[in-house]
Amino acid sequence: MASDSSAQPKSVHEFVVRDARGNDVDLSIYKGKVLLIVNVASQCGLTNSNYTEMTELYEKYRELGLEILAFPCNQFGNQEPGSNEEVLEFACTRFKAEYPIFDKVDVNGSNAAPIYKFLKSSKGGLFGDGLKWNFTKFLVDKDGNVVDRYAPTTSPKSIEKDVKKLLGIQK
């Protein structure tokens, strides 16, 4: 939800979302951080490579200001059927994910989470705004502006240069 329902949100930082443990998280805590926001799934063909590379990217740039926000979603092929606890166990044990895992959300349709409505309206896809599959990635700058959207098949490693640019890292 945006803080003020009468005005359209202008930044990711205006949203409050629920984490996988049921706690509300005000995304304004990420002001000054570069964010990679990803809809994740445990049983997708893209799961292993994406989780592995997201963890590597996070370990490399976390101290420099990168945060990865993972939102489980079961809208694509029912590939995230588990409970929040099961998703946490899977991501944190199998892939050593130390970045935040949020409550399972819808990313498309009338029940889409407000944060995803904002992300999609900020950076539409090649064939419309709707997400086409798991592991669609949104890159957000330190001010909460959505600067890029990447297809599910775009590997996290391949966007490292864009992350570095937003972090102000040369080379």
Curated annotation (Swiss-Prot):
Predominant cellular place of this UniProt entry's protein: cytoplasm
SUPFAM superfamilies, per the entry: Thioredoxin-like (SSF52833)
GO MF, one example: peroxidase activity
Entry protein name: Probable phospholipid hydroperoxide glutathione peroxidase
Function statement: Protects cells and enzymes from oxidative damage, by catalyzing the reduction of hydrogen peroxide, lipid peroxides and organic hydroperoxide, by glutathione.
A GO CC term assigned to this protein in UniProt: cytosol
Transmembrane segments: none
Membership in a protein family: Belongs to the glutathione peroxidase family.
EC number: 1.11.1.12
Keyword hit for Oxidoreductase: yes
